[in-house]
Curated annotation (Swiss-Prot):
It catalyses: L-threonylcarbamoyladenylate + adenosine(37) in tRNA = N(6)-L-threonylcarbamoyladenosine(37) in tRNA + AMP + H(+). GO terms for cellular component: cytoplasm. The keyword ATP-binding does not apply. Binds 1 Fe(2+) ion per subunit. Belongs to the KAE1 / TsaD family. This is tRNA N6-adenosine threonylcarbamoyltransferase. Its cofactor is Fe(2+). Required for the formation of a threonylcarbamoyl group on adenosine at position 37 (t(6)A37) in tRNAs that read codons beginning with adenine. Is involved in the transfer of the threonylcarbamoyl moiety of threonylcarbamoyl-AMP (TC-AMP) to the N6 group of A37, together with TsaE and TsaB. TsaD likely plays a direct catalytic role in this reaction. Pfam families: TsaD. Keywords: Acyltransferase, Cytoplasm, Iron, Metal-binding, Transferase, tRNA processing. CDD domains: ASKHA_NBD_TsaD_bac.
Length: 331
């Protein structure tokens, strides 16, 4: 089964061609990072306009790179949410138009489901499994019992982990996107500052990073007030040590309690080298499945893989009406 998939939930424009829920025939991705860098973050209206400008080119590139014809496509899948509503609508309208014009079945896919199924591209998901989903907008622990059978165990009570990284980067004047810069600098410094590790004892599966973020702000502010010299690398290392310790320990505890066969680490923050390293060092009795870096970030291949399994269980839409949502329910 050949699927054309579209992903425009935030600031990456991506169109992919996948086959049988496993093989990626093409995965065209166009990042808008340079467009948004002067503003210190994603500007929704600018993101939407950039998607519009590149959409036709990305459709053409994905089909050509895959070496297929439009008539070979069995299903069109598109990210339905969550995400920036303007960006989502660009992708949905493009996918719907393409599907209707060529009379190909259409399906909407949850963006977060796509992140989970990115692990299936280069590995083999073994159920039941535990997923740590970490991104700029989400931090969740999920019990995946089978294909599309997902139970939300815990989530963030305030800042998502990727959001916390970006805010700390902004405090330190590191620019946008901040997460990769903090990760890189953390490896050049030492975790010499004793920052809090918010484990939330009464809520073992939930997360909270706002207090840690505030502690970093206070630490830097106080050192500047005292004219005390400090290395940004050490601040980054201390922050990352606290974040990864919480993420890894909560994941380990949940896996032990639930008796899962595998752990999947997914989402944009799954590209973080500190997290990937600590996860493998601390959890040695279970297989840890983490997508390669190119499949951690937003791209359409993961949407195509998820769509294959969703189609097998639910089928396609009965018509070509698809509504986007910035806060679509995951479960």
């Amino acid at each position: 089964m050949i699927i054309l998939s579209v992903e425009t939930s935030c600031d990456e424009t991506s169109v992919a061609i996948t086959k049988d829920g496993k093989t990626v025939l093409s995965n065209a991705v166009l990042s808008q990072i340079k467009i948004h860098q002067p503003y210190g973050g994603v500007v929704p209206e600018i993101a939407s306009r950039a998607h519009i400008e590149s959409m036709l080119y990305m459709f053409d590139k994905a089909i050509k790179d895959a070496g297929i014809k439009v008539s070979d496509i069995d299903l069109v899948a598109v990210t339905q949410g969550p995400g920036l509503i303007g960006s989502l609508l660009v992708g949905i309208n493009a996918a719907t138009t393409f599907a209707y014009a060529n009379q190909i079945p259409l399906m909407g896919v949850n963006h977060l489901l796509g992140h989970i199924y990115a692990a299936q591209i280069e590995g083999e998901m073994k159920f039941p499994l535990l997923t740590l989903l970490v991104s700029g907008g989400h931090t969740e622990l999920l019990l995946v019992k089978d294909h599309l059978e997902i139970e939300l165990l815990g989530t963030t009570l305030d800042d998502a982990v990727g959001e916390a990284y970006d805010k700390v980067a902004r405090m330190l004047g590191l620019g946008y996107p901040g997460g990769p810069v903090v990760d890189r600098l953390a490896h050049q410094g030492e975790a010499i500052y004793n920052l809090p590790k918010p484990f939330l004892k009464n809520e073992p599966f939930n997360f909270s990073f706002s207090g840690l973020k505030s502690s970093v702000l206070n630490l830097v502010h106080n050192m500047k007030q005292r004219n005390e010299p400090f290395k940004v690398e050490d601040v980054c290392a201390s922050f990352q040590e606290s974040v990864t310790e919480v993420l890894v320990q909560k994941t380990k505890d949940a896996a032990n309690n639930l008796g899962v066969k595998q752990i999947v680490v997914a989402g944009g923050v799954a590209a973080n080298k500190g997290l990937r390293t600590k996860m493998k060092e601390r959890i040695t009795d279970l297989e840890i499945l983490t997508p390669s870096i190119k499949y951690c970030t937003d791209q359409a291949a993961m949407i195509g893989i998820a769509a294959y399994y969703q189609f097998k269980k639910q089928g396609a839409l009965k018509d070509y009406y698809l509504k986007g949502s910035s806060a679509i329910n995951f479960i």
